[in-house]
Amino acid sequence: MTPIAPTDDYPDNFVLDDEIMEEIRYYESEYRCGRRVYSLIKATTKDEIHTKDKCRIFYVNNIALTWMIRKYYLPIIRFLQMFPTLSECAVGVNSESQEWQQLDAFMKRHPNLIGGDYSKYDQKIPAQLILAGFKILTLLARRCNYSEEDIFVMETLAADVAYAYVMFNGDL
């Protein structure tokens, strides 16, 4: 990354280097052709103090895959986050806020609800469930007039995420 002149809106302004932009263009061209990129996802331990028996893991994408996910899915996810009672999605809602209380009251009016936050979900979640989540976002993208080409990219990208190759301590 190369720093560039800051602005009021972007005080830490930068541009991505040509090598990174070329990788992003490669990912996009492969996805547009319906070919997976098989990007490696790195699993790494969190830098936290825990008991000897507990070690928390998180997953890291490279910047090209992150760029693609954010380009195609972030506008829809942002919309869902902005309207938690409409989307019934509490990601990003402060649990000590009035918005949380409104969401709680709304959800309790209905007899069926799912608590989607459960222990070790990122280690146990099946690919089919990941793909189902992406499918919902893709259906919303269709309703938002995404092009068929963009939908195709999103579906191929979803497969790369759902069936990811994860590298942990150098092992795949």
Give, region by region, the residue ranges found by the protein language model.
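Viral RNA-dependent RNA polymerase
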Residues: 1-172
